Amino acid sequence: MKRIFLFMAAAAAAMAVSAQSHVDRQRAAAAADVVYYELGGNKYTPEQVDSINRIVAEYYFDQFRGFQDPEAPYFMFMSKDSQLAMGIGGLVRMRGWYDVGYMTKSNGFSPYLITMDPAQRTSRDRLGVSPSGTGLFFRVIGRNKMLGHYQLYIEGNFNGYDHVGFQLKKAYATIGDVTVGYASSTFGDPAAQPPVIDAQGANNKISNTTVLLRYMHTFRSGWTAAVSVENPTTAVATDGVSTAAASTVCPDGAAFVQYAWGPTSHVRLSGIVRSVGYRDLISERTHRRAGWGVLLSATGHPADPLTVYATLNYGRGTSSMGGDLICGAYDLLPDVADPGHMYAPASLGWNLGLQYNFRPDIFASASFSQTRLYAREGTAGSEYKYGLWACANLFWNLTPRIQAGVEFDWGLRCNVDGYARSARRVGAMCQFTF
């Protein structure tokens, strides 16, 4: 089949930088004019142009894209009958930072990782730099008389071994309203997370990616609903003496209901139920504990240059799905009053972020979040109780495809015994997308 090469004009893509939020920017890329080049030099009919535009618009629609995800690419290939298109894109991202305080060596700034014992640190300060976050993606979009619209998506980035190894990030297929593959969990809302430079982000962020089967439908009235079954990933604090990990026997079930007013403002209620197992080595029996979580998230524009981001999550047995607690094993904790038994502790997290656009190409944001673990009485005093995180940043889009930014991060960790320590980070970033 003869292929057609498409080039998205840079002048048209400039529309993206005038958007108020990262959601606006990514959607604006879909509205960019496209200059079409057919290798054979043939002209398109109006019907073919309309078909191409419909497919290109489909290319960018995604309910699960966040600020750090790649934007729409400049380059696409399309079949001669305009029924199949393939886009190739990516980004080159460089981050640098300077830590002040007791932060454990890590690319991501997480309050959980603050070193509570000063004797474990030879120096309070640390300089770091990393190309992690650099990535590539491929998306194929097609249309079939029997299947309707379908798409295949593969994304990888250099976050693997030693933070430079290539690692699969997403790989899924969507046919109509059905998605199957390795994709963002239905229990999450990346679009409601504020812009950040640091790889970790807000310490309550739900950011799980897993193998799933999802049905999602958008209604004309602005409502969207989704339900999925997902492969679970759990983290259980077993000791190998009285308790041990047990195999997974039941998938997670997740769902959300969302109402959107306008293309980039919405409120979403998400939920998840799961089964987390462990082995009681004293009685030699396997037990299952019920886990569940709810997430309320929203983003919108109360004023033209202002964007608000907000999330609130609560649950039991869902700590391994993101945020501060993903650094530990808190889906199940040992019951100190009953050896051999475990329980699912409750956890609460919230985040509020504001973004202000000074100019179409310059914007700033500030965010504050907290995560709290509600462990039972008798938990060791050195265990994590809560963490606080705050950041302020400034971004400049030098061109529609080149972005630079600076950021200040602050974090605090408080243990069960009340002992607390803080850390600070100054970071910078420059990235080019294509």
Predicted segments with their positions:
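Bacterial Sec-dependent N-terminal signal peptides
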Residues: 1-24
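N-terminal periplasmic/intermembrane-space "pro-region" immediately following the signal or transit peptide
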Residues: 19-100
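Surface-exposed extracellular loop regions of Gram-negative outer-membrane beta-barrel proteins
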Residues: 131-153, 253-281, 357, 361-369, ...
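Outer-membrane beta-barrel "beta-signal"
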Residues: 396-398, 421-434
